[in-house]
Amino acid sequence: MYDIKKWRHIFKLDPAKHISDDDLDAICMSQTDAIMIGGTDDVTEDNVIHLMSRVRRYPLPLVLEISNIESVMPGFDFYFVPTVLNSTDVVFHNGTLLEALKTYGHSIDFEEVIFEGYVVCNADSKVAKHTKANTDLTTEDLEAYAQMVNHMYRLPVMYIEYSGIYGDVSKVQAVSEHLTETQLFYGGGISSEQQATEMAAIADTIIVGDIIYKDIKKALKTVKIKESSK
C-alpha cells in the first residue's frame, strides 16, 4: 500500500479532456508522486475507464477523485471522496458518499478510501457553481474550517481548491498553521515552477492540473519541487 503522506506532487488528469500519448507518457514518467483522475463536467464511466487503462501502463499510484457514482469502478489504488465544507447543498457534504455506500458499501475496502475536507475558493470556477459553494471566505473562515477538519472531523486530507486561478498564499499559510494531523492539499492555477515552489513550501501536497493541457513543458517543471524539502 502506498503512503499518501509522502506525496508532495500530484498530476490531476481530467477524463473529459484530450491528452496525447506523448504528453501522457511525459506526465507519468515525470517522477510525480501520483496521478489523480477527476473533473467536474462530463465525467463518465467510459472516459474514466479509457484514461485509467492508459495510465495503468505506468508504475505509479492511481487515484480516482469521485464526482459522481456512475463513474466509480474498481482498479484504482485510492478513491478520494470530497466533502465540500463550504457548499450550501448537503448533497456535496455527504450525499455522494451516502449513495456510494448504499451502492458499493458491501464491497468497499476502506483502506483505499480517503476523505477530503474540500474548501472551494474560486467563485467563477465550474466546481464552485456545481457544488453551490459559498466562496466569500475570510482568513478567519478558512482557519475555522481547518480546525473543524483537523480537530473535530479528523479527516486525513484538507483540500484548498482555487480551480483555475492561483490562490491567496497568505490564506493557504493560515490554514496550514492550524493543521497538525491533517495533510494539506493545494490545487488551483499552478502554472510555473515558481508558483509550484511557493505553494509547496506551505502545503504538504500540490495538485497540478490545467497547465498540463495548456503548456506541457511548464507542467513538467512543477515536479522539480520534489528536489527541495518542505
Swiss-Prot record:
E.C. designation(s): 2.5.1.n9
Annotated catalysed reactions: sn-glycerol 1-phosphate + all-trans-heptaprenyl diphosphate = 3-heptaprenyl-sn-glycero-1-phosphate + diphosphate
Superkingdom, taxonomy of origin: Bacteria
Example of a GO MF term: prenyltransferase activity
Cofactor: Mg(2+)
Pathway(s) of this molecule: Membrane lipid metabolism; glycerophospholipid metabolism
Residues given in the record as sn-glycerol 1-phosphate binding sites: 12, 159-164, 189, 209-210
Annotated Mg(2+) binding sites: 14, 40
Family matches, as InterPro entries: GGGP/HepGP_synthase_I, GGGP/HepGP_synthase_sf, GGGP_HepGP_synthase
One Gene Ontology term from the biological process aspect of the record: glycerophospholipid biosynthetic process
Top-level EC class: transferase
Pfam families, A to Z: PcrB
Keyword line: Lipid biosynthesis, Lipid metabolism, Magnesium, Metal-binding, Phospholipid biosynthesis, Phospholipid metabolism, Transferase
Coiled-coil ranges from the UniProt annotation: none
Subunit (UniProt): Homodimer.
HAMAP family: GGGP_HepGP_synthase
Family label: Belongs to the GGGP/HepGP synthase family. Group I subfamily.
Function comment: Prenyltransferase that catalyzes in vivo the transfer of the heptaprenyl moiety of heptaprenyl pyrophosphate (HepPP; 35 carbon atoms) to the C3 hydroxyl of sn-glycerol-1-phosphate (G1P), producing heptaprenylglyceryl phosphate (HepGP). This reaction is an ether-bond-formation step in the biosynthesis of archaea-type G1P-based membrane lipids found in Bacillales. To a much lesser extent, is also able to use geranylgeranyl diphosphate (GGPP; C20) as the prenyl donor.
Name used for this protein in its record: Heptaprenylglyceryl phosphate synthase
Organism classification: Bacteria, Bacillati, Bacillota, Bacilli, Bacillales
Gene: pcrB
